[in-house]
């Protein structure tokens, strides 16, 4: 793309997340197979000069094998352990195509209204010819940690992501979220993001975002 896009700083973001259990008791009485799908769309709804385009849409299907666990570690209850396969792409052709495939481990802990999820991952290698973002792990990271606290129907979340590298390959992101009940299933939602990888097309750009909106359901 030779002509730079004339984009507004203010846009609308839609997120659709679905997750369901497709097989309970994969190994007799243990192990449940879940499949999920997440879609993020960034809409330049206020950009009337350029026909209000969708700036970016990212698609992320995944399959996860989860195990319930019961152990204690430093006063925290180990609740879940999982392993999954994840594909994320923006569905575009070169030179704007962005995608990667990962194997992701999930380890979850709970304690007194707090939940901590630790997710290290490994990127599945691609051939040099097909890889349109070979350095994506240095920006989107090699793992993240999510900390969630629930109280009085409200939920505060912190996501920390890191490349787990030093020097020029040291990049990451942080996101703070807050959701609270409004009416029925509607919840108010606010978020602040700083770092790399808020969307795939901008994976190697350091950016800051602040947003407010509504959500129908909360899950993580």
Where are each of the predicted segments found?
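Outer-membrane beta-barrel "beta-signal"
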Residues: 207-220
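Detector for outer-membrane/organellar transmembrane beta-barrel domains
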Residues: 88-163
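Outer-membrane beta-barrel architecture
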Residues: 17, 62-64, 104-108, 144-148, ...
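Transmembrane beta-barrel domains of Gram-negative outer membranes and organellar outer membranes
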Residues: 1-89
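Transmembrane beta-strand segments that form the barrel wall of outer-membrane beta-barrel proteins
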Residues: 1-3, 39-41, 81-91, 116-124, ...
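Residues that define the transmembrane beta-barrel architecture of outer-membrane proteins
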Residues: 10-14, 31, 55-61, 79, ...
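Short loop/turn motifs that connect adjacent beta-strands in outer-membrane beta-barrel proteins
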Residues: 23-33, 69-80, 95, 112-115, ...
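Solvent-exposed loop/turn segments connecting transmembrane beta-strands
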Residues: 6-10, 27, 48-51, 91-99, ...
